[in-house]
């Protein structure tokens, strides 16, 4: 007896998951149990369309896709770039925009001008390292922080 195959979606927890579900609803695909704000479940199923959804921390979603635990993942471009997994970006859904910026004391500007080593704290160390190395030709010390 063969097991029925489900199309599995890994969704980053939070706003992107909600926006993704809203998008699915626009085309007639629902998963009512995901709307229950009190649920502690992380895996949800739509039996009608043979779809499985699971909620994960956003940085883990590309890993689930790369290793086949999910067929499709929905995360922000920042996560795709930072995690640098062997995945293919099929479509930009056009929501969940973010902006990254570099800020610091005015004295850091002088260090950058003279290509002196600076210290950079970021939630996205790979993106920061790539930016400073390839765009600014600057060697930096990266400190990983997890944001607020």
Model region roles, listed by residue range:
Residues 1-148:
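Domain-level signature for soluble enzymes in the chorismate/prephenate branch of the shikimate pathway
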């Amino acid at each position: 007896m063969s097991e029925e195959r489900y199309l599995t979606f890994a969704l980053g927890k939070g706003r992107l998951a909600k926006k993704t579900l809203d998008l699915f609803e626009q085309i007639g695909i629902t998963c009512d149990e995901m709307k229950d704000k009190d649920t502690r479940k992380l895996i949800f199923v739509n039996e009608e369309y043979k779809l499985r959804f699971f909620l994960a921390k956003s940085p883990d979603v590309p890993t689930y896709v790369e290793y086949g635990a999910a067929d499709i993942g929905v995360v922000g471009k920042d996560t795709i770039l930072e995690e640098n997994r062997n995945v293919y970006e099929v479509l930009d859904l056009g929501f969940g925009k973010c902006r990254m910026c570099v800020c610091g004391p005015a004295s850091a500007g002088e260090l950058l001008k003279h290509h002196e080593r600076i210290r950079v704290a970021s939630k996205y160390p790979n993106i920061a390292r790539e930016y400073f190395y390839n765009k600014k030709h600057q060697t930096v010390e990266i400190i990983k922080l997890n944001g607020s």
